[in-house]
Design a protein with these regions (language model features):
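Bacterial N-terminal signal peptides
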Residues: 4-14
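Extracellular, repeat-based ectodomains that mediate carbohydrate processing or recognition
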Residues: 19-415
Length: 415
């Protein structure tokens, strides 16, 4: 069930139907003067490497310029044509998978994995707050969400005995954006894990918190989600993807990975992931929508168009905004080299796929992360490589609707 039903119970605004309804600015390098041998990565759990807060855009990534993997942030005023000089946010021997969360008023919260633990710090164009370790056990893959910039939920994968388990903690920030407290982490599913749980994504609305993750308890990977209406008491996990039973030759389940969540409209939640139920051609991009703040999700929907059917898709990211607009980005090589592709929700369903010109050329364009601002502008970052195995560079471009093809006007949310 989609986040807006077609005409009966609308829940999302919907973008224009035309595939050519976006104008993109020229691409900008996020980080300057990087040596050719440096590898940059955009690998946050749930693909949240970019966020907009007030009039400021922030991007986080990891690279090995210092000789070890470390995490960095760079800022850009929305009207500016270049990014600030990047700032080093990690403090340990090595750091990975940074995520960024908008707190409001040009402030952000960054989270990352450092030396086997999860760390947080507030960041803004005016400076960095103190770095705070919030986990003790072997942990990683942190994801963050908030509704008000003051009360934040952090989730990550943490080793519990032989296996990893998804845990959650509440973080509180003060009036100036400083971290003032972090609760002890609690398992989202209190049962001891019987196999690994990994790569969580989290969404927070006024109706509560929803966490989705990869889970191996059935002997194959499924996507599970759990919802907490109040506090940190989560419901029993439920399947997000529709499990396709295969033969012994092709294995059990459909093969799913890398779920990402985003809030859209009046507290609704959209999900996307890679799904190999059409196993002959590799992963496809699927989606599902929750109309009740994450307590339940509707039917799975194929987000890509028919032109993508013979190609594998990778690295899905999703973004929504308060107007109810929803867009998904990924990379595939249907045109001969890997390009970034977009699909967005319209009144007719998912749009035809569109490759933004700055992120589609004879180079390798992969690993997108996206954010929609309140005006419906799309902020896109991705990795650009000369060849498939060469060092990647984080690039940025902004997309706007054409003036004669604006989104449909919003309709009241269903009750």
């Amino acid at each position: 069930m989609m986040c807006r039903l077609l005409l009966a119970l609308p829940l999302i605004t919907g973008f224009p139907v035309q595939a050519d309804s976006w104008n993109f600015d020229n691409k900008i390098a996020v980080s300057k003067n990087i040596e050719a041998s440096v590898f940059q990565h955009l690998d946050s759990s749930g693909r949240k490497n970019i966020a907009v807060s007030g009039k400021t855009l922030a991007v986080v990534w990891e690279d090995n310029r210092s000789g070890a993997s470390q995490t960095y942030v760079a800022f850009k005023k929305l009207e500016a044509n270049e990014f600030s000089k990047e700032q080093h946010i990690s403090t340990g021997k090595s750091a990975f998978t940074p995520a960024i969360l908008a707190l409001g008023e040009d402030r952000f919260l960054a989270g990352w994995e450092q030396d086997g633990a999860v760390w947080l710090r507030t960041v803004s164009p005016t400076g960095l707050g103190p770095a705070l370790q919030i986990s003790q056990a072997e942990t990683g893959q942190v994801a963050l969400a908030t509704t008000d910039g003051r009360n934040i939920i952090a989730v990550w994968s943490q080793r519990t005995g032989r296996f990893t388990q998804i845990v959650a903690a509440m973080i509180k920030t003060g009036a100036r954006g400083e971290i003032i407290s972090a609760s002890a982490p609690k398992p989202v599913d209190p049962k001891l894990p019987v196999d690994d749980q990994s790569y969580p994504s989290v969404a927070l609305t006024k109706k509560g918190a929803t966490v989705a993750w990869e889970d191996r308890r059935r002997g194959h990977t499924v996507l599970l989600y759990s919802h907490a209406a109040t506090g940190m008491t989560f419901s029993a996990p439920q399947p997000l993807n529709e499990v396709v039973q295969k033969s012994e030759q092709y294995g059990r389940g459909s093969g799913v990975t890398r779920v990402a969540l985003s809030v859209c409209g009046n507290g609704q939640i959209a999900a996307t992931w890679m799904d190999k139920r059409g196993y002959q051609t590799g992963y496809d991009i699927y989606s599902a929508f929750s109309r009740d703040g994450g307590a339940s999700f509707g039917a799975n929907e194929l987000a890509q168009d028919a032109f993508a059917d013979q190609y594998a898709q990778w690295h899905p990211a999703i973004a929504g905004n308060a107007s109810g607009e929803v867009i998904v980005a990924w990379d595939d090589d249907r045109d001969g080299t890997s390009d970034i592709w977009l699909a967005w929700k319209t009144k007719r369903g998912w749009s035809a796929n569109f490759a933004p010109p700055p992120a589609s050329n004879n180079r390798q364009q992969t690993n997108p992360a996206i954010s929609l601002d309140t005006q419906g502008n799309l902020h896109l970052v991705w990795l650009e490589q000369e060849t498939e195995n060469s060092p990647g560079r984080v690039m940025y471009a902004m997309g706007q609707h054409q003036s004669d093809s604006q989104p449909l006007s919003a309709a009241p949310s269903a009750k």
